[in-house]
Amino acid sequence: MTKRCSWVKMSNPLYITYHDEEWGQPLHDDQALFELLCMETYQAGLSWETVLNKRQAFREAFHGYHIQAVAEMTDTELENLLENPAIIRNRAKIFATRANAQAFLRLQAEYGSFDAYLWSFVEGKTVVNDVLDYRQSPAKTALSKKLAKDLKKRGFKFTGPVAVLSFLQAVGLVDDHENDCEWKSGH
């Protein structure tokens, strides 16, 4: 029998696929990084399952997460999204998506890519943590606090240290798969 992290909701195929094919895999594509950063910002105060179930609708609402297109969305376009029942209709989170796209573009201009900026925080190598049980893992770390502080300084929204740690785990900068999970680095 396949051994996954115990947080995976086995009743939801999207959850299983997300864990098996995406979560914790080192990611270097800026557009994919932007999408996952946005998803983590939407999660604030909600369950990950809620966000995952609305993922496709968010992609459609935000131009497939094409960063430039999102950065150029008008207030009217964003206001119209508040009428879309397929997404999380939180005004602050919707407007934060545009603000984060704009901040993302500034980082790309400065570093050549968001990927280069992000991976510089871990010297290009995934941090592999010893995780016996995810429920005993910290909600934030020194790394997530440092990155969250820098992102905030650069104009990002909804990127506190808890959301940032979830993002770092999702995009493979931090491997927090449980030790007995088949997807754990070196397992």
Positions of the model-derived regions?
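HhH-family (HhH-GPD) DNA N-glycosylase catalytic core used in base-excision repair
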Residues: M1-H187
